[in-house]
A protein has these predicted regions:
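Residue-level marker of intrinsically disordered, low-complexity segments enriched
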Residues: 28, 32, 80-83, 98-99, ...
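Aromatic-Pro/Gly-enriched surface loop or interdomain linker
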Residues: 1-30, 34, 72-73, 162, ...
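Short amphipathic alpha-helical segments and helix-helix/interface helices
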Residues: 1, 48-52, 82, 132, ...
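Generic preference for flexible, low-structure residues
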Residues: 24-26, 44-47, 67, 77, ...
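A glycine-rich, often tryptophan-bearing local segment used as a flexible ligand/cofactor-contacting loop or short
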Residues: 37-123, 141, 149
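Structural motif
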Residues: 14-16, 33-38, 64-67, 147, ...
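A glycine-centered loop/beta-turn motif at secondary-structure junctions
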Residues: 5, 56, 60-64, 106, ...
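Alpha-helical scaffolding within the catalytic cores
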Residues: 15-22, 45-49, 149-153
């Protein structure tokens, strides 16, 4: 909805279809990997290989979810993938209880504003009991969002031979369509994507 709301087209598929090669990611400028509240394995070894190959060709990857970092840290292969390929690392488990995210000083000033995500049961979206705190794992990676209650990082971006954006909370749990559209538009600007391009949207 956020991509459509900002005027971009997209194609939706399952993680399995992407990992098994049913969908060819190389024809799309972005993969938006929605992890939600998924637990281990967060990103399977097969999917890791697919994403590694995609990024090696200069791709753009957005990943959001509550457990990408915390559930990857107990497995050496998963942790290496997150640190060396996605360019992020775990700062803290259970990083926020208030459900508020603020932008912070970074080279990407257009990623700005305050965002809120759902922490209580509601009829619209699942509630978030815990989220990951994140840190950059590369000199070319930067923190773009923080949880104001403790200043722990909530989101990072990496810009090198490819680009990644990692959020320690589920993007879809943001409270309002306006918040989702605003943040998505900023992320797509970071990825330098034009509206005529297709977006690969992974659910």
């Amino acid at each position: 909805q956020a991509m459509a709301g900002t005027g971009y087209s997209f194609v939706s598929c399952s993680h399995k279809s992407l990992a098994e090669g049913v969908v060819k990611p190389d024809t799309y400028p972005i993969i938006d990997l929605i992890l939600g509240k998924q637990r281990q394995p967060v990103i399977t070894p097969v999917l890791q290989d697919t994403l590694r190959s995609y990024l090696a060709q200069g791709g753009n990857l957005l990943v959001s979810g509550t457990n990408l970092f915390s559930d990857s840290w107990g497995n050496a292969q998963d942790r290496t993938f997150v640190e060396e390929v996605l360019k992020g690392k775990l700062a803290s488990r259970n990083a926020s209880k208030e459900g508020i995210v603020n932008s912070c000083a970074s080279p990407y000033g257009y990623i700005n504003g305050r965002y809120t995500f759902r922490t209580r049961p509601n009829p619209i979206c699942y509630s978030i009991e815990s989220v990951d705190g994140v840190l950059p794992a590369d000199k070319l990676a930067h923190t773009i969002l923080r949880y104001p209650e403790n200043n722990i990082g909530a989101g990072i971006v990496y810009e090198g031979k490819y680009r990644t954006c990692l959020l320690g909370f589920p993007f879809e749990a943001l409270q309002t369509p306006s918040e989702r559209n605003r943040l998505m538009e900023s992320i797509l600007r970071f990825f330098s994507i034009q509206q005529q391009n297709k977006i690969q949207y992974i659910q």
